[in-house]
């Protein structure tokens, strides 16, 4: 008997000490997934210790159980001196760590002024429910949640083009599971991975789903532009989570060689930025970007120092030295920092990713043009009516938008995005013209529809198409979709299309298990079918890089209606046809999504902007003081690498804004005038618009000729000297050049060295395809050119005195004269600083 008792005690101890799934020594192989489903609280070993999960049954007979590991630490808590620092690997823990409850959310403020126009509709419509997920907040928040399937999925038919009725074939994947890491959105200010239960997606798609918390707002993205606080801590948190997965996911039955990152909104922007960062190289293989890119106006913060100053002043940390200011901010409580109301320019962000020369080494578009994302398969798309929140405030009634409200909204949109008064008049009228339905221009509902399309096209569609095209230009696999469905929920206007974030419940399989507090919809069988379709596409892509393979579309288990997606083959996006999949109840593969409007934003608007800047370079006026950082006397620690403020000359009396402007209406809007005057105004406006188009065409042709000339004259890049073309460095290191010689020297460097033609060096540089300035706020400081990185001194002092004007609005600025503490134009070490 005593021998039997000893044996039983030994078995129990073995189960507690690692005899369960993933048991054994840390770093050893985990056990099979089948054993995970046999225990109520399975234990898995990781490189840092053992964790105990919990087995959950799902409310659907076709879905197998899922083991959840909630609140697993992937980094050391960023407390004290670790605030405003990159994350570190977690410390090991003794015994078995309980991972059965959700972790705390990162500090955020849902009760302050929210950027509602940028947040998902389901979030803003259910703020009380969303608040329950972030009630438990802590700066110690760097945790992830893992959802591991316990079954390999049902038998299904294997796609066979040659067989009309293929037999049931076992294509279940019993090996290592693909891994899908979800990056939540929320304008980099709100949200948590706890809001998204990955159980249904894991069980239905036979993948391991992971969600995480990363630092948000000021704690995740504050930047001073120098070594004191480089920023991008939230992105570094995501990279650290990927490192943890690469090291540990095999213990949970996952495949570290098949990791896919996916996100929505700001999370999708993070996906794009991680694709472009060398820090994440080799940590994942595929990427899905839902309604977000790295080249939207809200994706990157181009003026972080401005908002850092504002925050520091609000909490009593306004110091001239940036190191002292950051140390002061470290001593403040997280709640005091998070609760400060620091409002960005409309359509922009106050705290978000910055171009630091390291994590984000250059402007995202420049990196994409250089082919920095060739190693990743990509799936990207948008929803039909992303800009719903932009329009709701302008919708005065159920009858739509009045003509005056339409004009005001467009004017406000242009005023907040473009910083030159003369150019805005041209852009404003051109945008109104393009987004007026001339067949039914007096219809308020049609005005509302076109206004919704305007915001959607500018903020989501055009950047997404540009990103997909840049990817496809390098023959890299990319799939594009448009989502045309949303669930029926109370409070949603009948005229609303699929808005920002409406695809998320279908991606996570919410219709299969019923409505939740965040998604209180009346889900129908069609919703269940569409969710199954989306999950199949997403998990197929995670498995093979092809959303069509290996699992075909088959939803006969839901209802007897045929699934139209069974006959659809999702084609790759290419630069010519630009194919995309229309995801809705009537799916179809089409090409050139909103091609006219996309070309308008990507081609015509940048040239109109260039036209203005070239015509008015000698008469640039100071933008409104409300959007400009006030000038100060230069301090001793101020860098000279920043764009100078415009000359402090007041505009002529006729240009001073004395009140609300009565913007010109479209011809025919002023019905109080006589017929003759109306005809005169109509003809005049038409001629004006034709002149604008003619000028735009002329300048476009001139720019194309100039671009071709630049390409012909540009020699192949060299690598020996660090100068484009491989020529020797210009002899300017020992002396300070006059401004004119500095400009010529810089243009000669870009043109190919000393041997280049000086006359050609004085020509404007070739502008980028998608003008960078159009994504910045009116008072944003532009980026330096690629390869022109310099370290900013440690100071939060006032801006420097203005250097001579640039030869081109998008060209580089002359480098500062060398000093005892200055650096060369190469990155001095792995951590460079923000270019502001």
Swiss-Prot record:
Disulfide bonds join 106-141, 317-328, 487-521. InterPro entries: AB_hydrolase_fold, CarbesteraseB, Carboxylesterase_B_CS, Neuroligin/BSAL, Nlgn. Residues 796-819 have a biased composition (Pro residues). Residues 1-14 form the signal peptide. Residues 679-699 are annotated as: Required for interaction with LHFPL4. GO terms for molecular function: cell adhesion molecule binding; identical protein binding; neurexin family protein binding. Keywords: Cell adhesion, Cell membrane, Cell projection, Disulfide bond, Glycoprotein, Membrane, Phosphoprotein, Postsynaptic cell membrane, Signal, Synapse, Transmembrane, Transmembrane helix. Disruption phenotype: No obvious phenotype, but mice present subtle behavorial changes. Signaling from inhibitory synapses is impaired. In addition, mice have reduced brain volume. Mice lacking both NLGN1 and NLGN2, or NLGN2 and NLGN3, are viable, but have impaired breathing, drastically reduced reproduction rates and striking deficits in raising their offspring. Mice lacking NLGN1, NLGN2 and NLGN3 are born at the expected Mendelian rate, but die shortly after birth due to respiratory failure. They do not show a significant change in the number of synapses, but synapse function is strongly impaired. Its main location: membrane. Pfam families: COesterase. Residues 717-728 have a biased composition (Gly residues). Residues 700-836 are cytoplasmic. Residues 15-678 are extracellular. Residues 824-836 have a biased composition (Polar residues). Glycans are attached at residues 98, 136, 522. The chain crosses the membrane at residues 679-699. One of its GO terms (cellular component) is presynaptic membrane. Residues 623-661, 711-735, 791-836 are annotated as: Disordered. Interacts with neurexins NRXN1, NRXN2 and NRXN3. Interaction with neurexins is mediated by heparan sulfate glycan modification on neurexin. Interacts (via its C-terminus) with DLG4/PSD-95 (via PDZ domain 3). Interacts with PATJ. Interacts with MDGA2. Interacts with GPHN. Interacts with MDGA1. Found in a complex with MAGI2 and IGSF9B, where it interacts with MAGI2 (via WW 1, WW 2 and PDZ 2 domains). Identified in a complex of 720 kDa composed of LHFPL4, NLGN2, GABRA1, GABRB2, GABRG2 and GABRB3. Interacts with LHFPL4; leading to mutual regulation of the protein level and synaptic clustering. Belongs to the type-B carboxylesterase/lipase family. Transmembrane scaffolding protein involved in cell-cell interactions via its interactions with neurexin family members. Mediates cell-cell interactions both in neurons and in other types of cells, such as Langerhans beta cells. Mediates cell-cell interactions between Langerhans beta cells and modulates insulin secretion. Plays a role in synapse function and synaptic signal transmission, especially via gamma-aminobutyric acid receptors (GABA(A) receptors). Functions by recruiting and clustering synaptic proteins. Promotes clustering of postsynaptic GABRG2 and GPHN. This is Neuroligin-2. It comes from Mus musculus (Mouse). The gene is Nlgn2.
């Amino acid at each position: 008997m005593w021998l039997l008792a000893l044996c039983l005690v030994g078995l129990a101890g073995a189960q507690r000490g690692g005899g369960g799934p993933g048991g054994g020594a840390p770093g050893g192989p985990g056990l099979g997934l089948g054993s995970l489903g046999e225990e109520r609280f399975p234990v898995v070993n990781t490189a840092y210790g053992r964790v105990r999960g919990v087995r959950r049954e799902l409310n659907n007979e076709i879905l197998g159980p899922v083991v959840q590991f909630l609140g697993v630490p992937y980094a050391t808590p960023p407390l004290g001196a670790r605030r405003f620092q990159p994350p570190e690997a977690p410390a090991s823990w003794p015994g078995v760590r309980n991972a059965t409850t959700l972790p705390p959310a990162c500090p955020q403020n849902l009760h302050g002024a929210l950027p509602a126009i940028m947040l998902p509709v389901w979030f803003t419509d259910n703020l009380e429910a969303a608040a329950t997920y972030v009630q438990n907040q802590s700066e110690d928040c760097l945790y992830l949640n893992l959802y591991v399937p316990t079954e390999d999925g049902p038998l299904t038919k294997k796609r066979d083009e040659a067989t009309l009725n293929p037999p049931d074939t076992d294509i279940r994947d019993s090996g290592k599971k693909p891994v899908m890491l979800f990056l939540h959105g929320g304008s980099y200010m709100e949200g948590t991975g706890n809001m998204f239960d990955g159980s249904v997606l894991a069980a239905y798609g036979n993948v391991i789903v992971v969600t995480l918390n990363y630092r948000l707002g000021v704690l995740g993205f504050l930047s001073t532009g120098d070594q004191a606080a480089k920023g991008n801590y939230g992105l570094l948190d995501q990279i650290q989570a990927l490192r943890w997965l690469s090291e540990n996911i095999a213990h949970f039955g996952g495949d570290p060689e098949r990791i896919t990152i996916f996100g929505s909104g700001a999370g999708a922007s993070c996906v794009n930025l991680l694709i472009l960062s060398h820090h994440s190289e080799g940590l994942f293989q595929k990427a899905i970007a839902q309604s977000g890119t790295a080249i939207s106006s809200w994706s990157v913060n181009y003026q972080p120092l401005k908002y850092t100053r504002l925050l520091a002043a609000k909490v009593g940390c306004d110091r001239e030295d940036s190191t002292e200011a950051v140390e002061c901010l470290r001593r403040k409580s997280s709640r005091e920092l998070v609760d400060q109301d620091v409002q960005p320019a409309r359509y922009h962000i106050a705290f978000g990713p910055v171009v630091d020369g390291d994590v984000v080494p250059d402007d995202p578009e420049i990196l994409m043009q250089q082919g920095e994302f060739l190693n990743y398969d990509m799936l990207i798309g948008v929803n039909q009516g992303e800009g719903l929140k932009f329009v709701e405030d302008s919708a005065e009634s159920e009858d739509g938008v009045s003509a005056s409200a339409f004009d005001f909204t467009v004017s406000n949109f242009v005023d907040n995005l473009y910083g030159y008064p003369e150019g805005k008049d041209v852009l404003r009228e051109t945008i109104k013209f393009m987004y007026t339905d001339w067949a039914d221009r007096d219809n308020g509902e049609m005005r509302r529809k076109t206004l919704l399309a305007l915001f959607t096209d500018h903020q989501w569609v055009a950047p997404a198409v540009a990103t997909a095209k840049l990817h496809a230009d390098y023959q890299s696999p990319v799939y594009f979709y448009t989502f045309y469905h949303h669930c029926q929920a109370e409070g949603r206007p009948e005229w609303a299309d699929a808005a920002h974030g409406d695809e998320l419940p279908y991606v996570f399989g919410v219709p299969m298990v019923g409505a939740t507090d965040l998604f209180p919809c009346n889900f129908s069988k069609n919703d269940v079918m569409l969710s199954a379709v989306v999950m199949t596409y997403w998990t197929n892509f995670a498995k093979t890089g092809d959303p069509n393979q290996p699992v075909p579309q088959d939803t006969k288990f839901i209802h007897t209606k045929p699934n139209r997606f069974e006959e659809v083959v999702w084609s790759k996006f290419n630069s010519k046809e630009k194919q995309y999949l229309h995801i809705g109840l009537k799916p179809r593969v089409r090409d050139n999504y909103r091609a006219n409007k996309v070309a308008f934003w990507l081609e015509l608007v940048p040239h109109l902007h260039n036209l203005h800047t070239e015509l008015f370079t000698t008469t640039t006026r100071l933008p409104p003081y409300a959007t400009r950082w006030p000038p100060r006397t230069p301090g001793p620690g101020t860098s000279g690498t920043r764009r100078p403020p415009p000359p402090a000359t007041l505009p002529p009396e006729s240009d001073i804004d004395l009140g609300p402007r009565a913007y010109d209406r479209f011809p025919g809007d002023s019905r109080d005038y006589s017929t003759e005057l109306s005809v005169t105004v109509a003809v005049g406006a038409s001629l004006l618009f034709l002149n604008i188009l003619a000028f735009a065409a002329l300048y476009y042709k001139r720019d194309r000729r100039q671009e071709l000339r630049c390409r012909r004259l540009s020699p192949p890049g060299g690598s020996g000297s660090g100068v484009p073309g491989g020529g020797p460095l210009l002899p300017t290191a020992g002396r300070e050049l006059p401004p004119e010689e500095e400009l010529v020297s810089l243009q000669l460097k870009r043109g190919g060295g000393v041997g280049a033609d000086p006359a050609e060096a004085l020509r404007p540089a070739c502008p980028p395809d998608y003008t960078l300035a159009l994504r910045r706020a009116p008072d944003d400081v532009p980026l330096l050119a690629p390869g022109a990185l310099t370290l900013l001194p440690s100071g939060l002092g006032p801006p420097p005195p203005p250097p001579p004007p640039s030869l081109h609005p998008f060209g580089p600025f002359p480098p500062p004269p060398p000093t005892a503490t200055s650096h060369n134009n190469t990155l001095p070490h792995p951590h460079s600083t923000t270019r502001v």
